[in-house]
Amino acid sequence: MLLHFDIVIQLLSSHTLKSHQVEPPMDFETSFEEFVEDKRFIALEVSDNDDDCDTDLTADTADELESSAILKMRESDASLNVTTGNNTSRKTTSNSKKRWSLLSNHSAVSSSKSKKRWSVLSSSFTSESHKDRESRNVLQQKRKSLQSYSSLDTVASNSSISASSSLKRSSTGLSLRQLFTKIGINDDISQPGIGIPQGKENLPPTMGKKNSSIASTSSENRLRTPLKPLVNHSKRPTSQPQQQQPLYNASLSSRRSSISSTVSSSSSSKWRFWKRNKNQTPALLQPDHHSLKTFPAVNRRDSMTPVEPRNMVKHKTSFSDFHKTIFSSNTYSESSDTISSMEITLKNKASSSSLSLNVLKKRNSQSSLKHKSSHASLQKFKRNKGKSSMIAPSTATNSSNDDSCSYSSKNSTLSHRISLPVPDQVSRDKIQNKLRYSTSLLSLNSKSSLPMNKNDHDETLLRQILLNCDIKRILNPAKGDVLPLINDVNHLSSIQLTSNVWQIGEVICKKVSLGTIDDITWDRKFLSLQELEKLKIMQQKFDGIPQLLKSFVVKEANGGLYLYLLFKDHGTPISLISLKNWKQILKIFWSCAGIIHGLEKNLKFEHRNLTLDNILIDGNGNITIIDFKCSRLQTPQDDVLYLRLDHPLFFLNGKDKSKINEYQYQFEFEIYQSMRILLNMDASAFEPMTNLYWLYYLSRVLLKFGDRKLGKNDANRDKMARVINHLEMNLAVHKRGGQLFKRLETEDIKNTGDLLKLYK
């Protein structure tokens, strides 16, 4: 609704003349339409055009805003100026129109009606309001009103008046009262020194007449910086000079009232719209220090810390946008001085997380350089450091002190050393146990190997072999030497059984290569020597051992040396025969157990490779165990003959899968692994449980072959099954997923003797 400017002047003049008369508060529940019909309020059109947002405003010098919120006014071509001397409004050109940017409350216009309302635009109050205020009910809620010119004069004269002498809150209606209650004090930007005469920036205007007795709730440090009015350049004539009057806005806050009560008292305030100038620098960034001293805001702790505006209002084209901006950040802090100082500190201080990350990226710990003792590692580290410094120069600069030790350590005595791993105690024990009885040249603890020349060591082994042979010299057929038991047999009738075994009539010839005399083949010679020694020892008084007929060394035409071992024919390996019945299977098993028990009891013997190929059976059903290269026994001189568990002979069967099925192949290496776990890689130790492992292997394989060819309905088959179950309970060699179970507690079978006692 657009009103002519003369009506506005008339209403304001009448309100000024009657400003000293205190009228009773009006009913809060009177409808808003009632006052619209009576025209007892001032309301001007608010344009939605952006060009109209720059309306110029020159407000009254004494008009004050309460601590809840401040809205700025717009002004058209003519501006209304009110003098401070006589408290009267100055009239400008009658053709000009003034536009206000929000509905205000009713002016104090004289009327014959009984109820009147105080306007938010009231410019002054007299001291009589204080008297009428004291005469009214003390229990009513007290509100702070806007300060008039006299209140500003009171502030300038440092008069101490109680804050309880404010007028009651009056409103035009419930809707406006709720609206103004929600609005908080949030100025966009303080405009220090706007409209203040030169030389009087720090002094508020004084009254020429008597001072008002209305209590002032704020002192000099509670005044806020004035806001710069915006000018509507599109409608204002450029030739018309604009006269500016000092504009002061007092920021009032009560120490006793809470934040909610302070905000709720906004209904008795004077609301205006304003718009920040695009080309103007915010007040916080301007070097205007005297404005902060002149218009400090008082926080809840009465400190002189200036209140920093928390809501930067940008260009708003409508009241709804401005309303949302005001309400979006309407928050108060009970300790604004502490909070403001903390905010400044936090802005200047980096977070701990980012600081720690930056430090870790830029620095290298000195402890990481302790292991870089070799010269090559330091040079590599230096090159990497140089590359990283090219990528991030600041990083290299910050870490130069930390990395100085890495560059200086080049010239130290540690720079030419090579850092080697240090084994723990468990690894040391394993290495010592492995090397204690090792026959290799690298082992100094071995009794069979001494520090000597390699050729001398090879010749020593060859002499020992000849000493254990039946013929103590090397036979050379090229020179006419006759080979015993072989020259008498036609070689055309020989049958090759394996790669190094032939059957010549009733004689089994095993041919083992020893290499040439000049070659260092100590491993072959050593294995041949051990096998020959074991056979010599076992043939003295034990059954089930192959009978060695002759042994000698032959030098063939190619210059190679071969050890010939001639045995009696003891039958065929059980892997190549067809089993007849379960009784035969059970006899094979117990015969092997008896042979091993005799050797175990007298020689502390362990076969350690009792496969089906190493068990022979003749036409009479007699069982013979062969191939003792991998076995372990103790000589009468208490020497231990054994082969280390990591020797390739334990893995030879994997290369010849054609002779064994997949089940047998996998089961063999499960037993190998079980032995390594049981012996803890100490192959020289005597552990009779290894014989039980292989007997368990033999029983399982025979049971599988019997089930496939003979069926399961047999009493001897049940006996074999009970033995297998008993061995499983004691050996725990059954596995799932390739790993052995923990050994059970019921260990009633510890050797082959215990097994024979249970099933005698």
Swiss-Prot record:
Enzyme Commission numbers on file: 2.7.11.1
Highest taxon in the source lineage: Eukaryota
Single GO MF descriptor: protein serine kinase activity
Modification after translation (UniProt): Periodically phosphorylated during the cell cycle with a phosphorylation peak during mitosis and hyperphosphorylated after DNA damage.
Keywords carried by this UniProt record: ATP-binding, Cell cycle, DNA damage, Kinase, Nucleotide-binding, Phosphoprotein, Serine/threonine-protein kinase, Transferase
Position of sequence motif KEN box: 200-202
GO BP: DNA damage response; intracellular signal transduction; mitotic cell cycle; mitotic morphogenesis checkpoint signaling
Binding annotation for ATP: I474, L475, N476, P477, A478, K479, G480, D481, V482, K510
Compositional bias of kind Low complexity: 251-264, 398-408
Reaction(s) the record says it catalyses: L-seryl-[protein] + ATP = O-phospho-L-seryl-[protein] + ADP + H(+); L-threonyl-[protein] + ATP = O-phospho-L-threonyl-[protein] + ADP + H(+)
Record's note on what induces expression: Absent in G1-arrested cells and accumulates in G2-M.
GO cellular component: cytoplasm; nucleus
Misc. comment: Present with 2190 molecules/cell in log phase SD medium.
Function of the protein: Serine/threonine haspin-like protein kinase involved in cell cycle regulation.
Protein name: Serine/threonine-protein kinase Haspin homolog ALK1
Organism: Saccharomyces cerevisiae (strain ATCC 204508 / S288c) (Baker's yeast)
